[in-house]
Amino acid sequence: MVHAKSWTLKKHFVGYPTNSDFELKTVELPPLKDGEVLLEALYLTVDPYMRIMAKSLKEGDMMMGEQVARVVESKNSAFPTGTIVLAPSGWTTHSISNGEKLEKVLAEWPDTLPLSLALGTVGMPGLTAYFGLLDICGVKGGETVLVSAAAGAVGSIVGQIAKLKGCKVVGTAGSDEKVAWLKKHGFDVALNYKTVKSLEEALKEAAPEGYDCYFDNVGGEFSNVAITQMKKFGRIAICGAISVYNRTSPLSPGPSPEIIIFKELHLQGFVVYRWQGEVRQKALRDLLKWVSEGKIQYHEHVTEGFENMPAAFIGLLKGENLGKAIVKA
């Protein structure tokens, strides 16, 4: 008899989520049917997109999300007991799956790397950085790249891939600690956007000739300013808008249409799940190789204990994490 603990949405968020918006429930799972497996969560992820996706949940629904899990009981020959998988099981300690949405961790995964990276640098955030920079922005060596939220799970990888491709990289973050981390890991310029006297002047000083590519993780007023610093024919990959996800007032106006028109800018939003099949597997292998070779550095902000899922999520939205926010079950 297995009891699963699950975090559910008690009430919809108003502004930043609070602990009282969540409720921890325990349910008894049924015996396995043929073709099913029982999963036990090892690591769980919290990500900004959950703030938006939670709007589509009904109160009482379990919070969504991926986890690295171990198969602890199996009636499915494709996933024997002990298999490590990525599972979209949500915020739960145990779950039952028929195997259709499970993904085994790469066979070549070395013992020297933590499995939690499959939720970060060698997972969805890493893939977001990879495809957003290489496919959407299409960066080339010698170009100048601006990355907002550069010390986050996605931005930190964007900047390092851009350096691997021979680009000049300017990153912005919200604390001096994060700025120091960016400088340590190869960013040519790193700025604390909260303390610069003028964001426009700071971005201009960092790249007087402008930016070829802007990887946008924050949206809002920051991005309105960043767009003014783009070169003609600049490309903007719109990945996220974390600066406005928790707003309680109307959204402020977007960037000036005149700038977009006369600079002939290309702005494109994207979601990483567009890339599937072999192209996705190649990207995962590339990311794993770069991490294994030390060409990409990672940092995890690990919260211990499944009971602290809400706190980890709230901290992420408030920018308390450096690198990927992970919960160790």
UniProtKB/Swiss-Prot annotation:
Primary location: cytoplasm
SUPFAM superfamilies assigned: GroES-like, NAD(P)-binding Rossmann-fold domains
Modified residues (Phosphoserine): S20
Entry GO terms, CC: cytoplasm
A GO biological process held by the record: prostaglandin metabolic process
Residues modified to N6-(2-hydroxyisobutyryl)lysine: K178
EC number of the protein: 1.3.1.48, 1.3.1.74
Residues binding NADP(+): 152-155, 178, 193, 217, 239-245, 270-272, 321
Described purpose of this protein according to its UniProt entry: NAD(P)H-dependent oxidoreductase involved in metabolic inactivation of pro- and anti-inflammatory eicosanoids: prostaglandins (PG), leukotrienes (LT) and lipoxins (LX). Catalyzes with high efficiency the reduction of the 13,14 double bond of 15-oxoPGs, including 15-oxo-PGE1, 15-oxo-PGE2, 15-oxo-PGF1-alpha and 15-oxo-PGF2-alpha. Catalyzes with lower efficiency the oxidation of the hydroxyl group at C12 of LTB4 and its derivatives, converting them into biologically less active 12-oxo-LTB4 metabolites.
Subunit annotation: Monomer or homodimer.
Record's protein name: Prostaglandin reductase 1
UniProt source species: Bos taurus (Bovine)
Gene name of the record: PTGR1
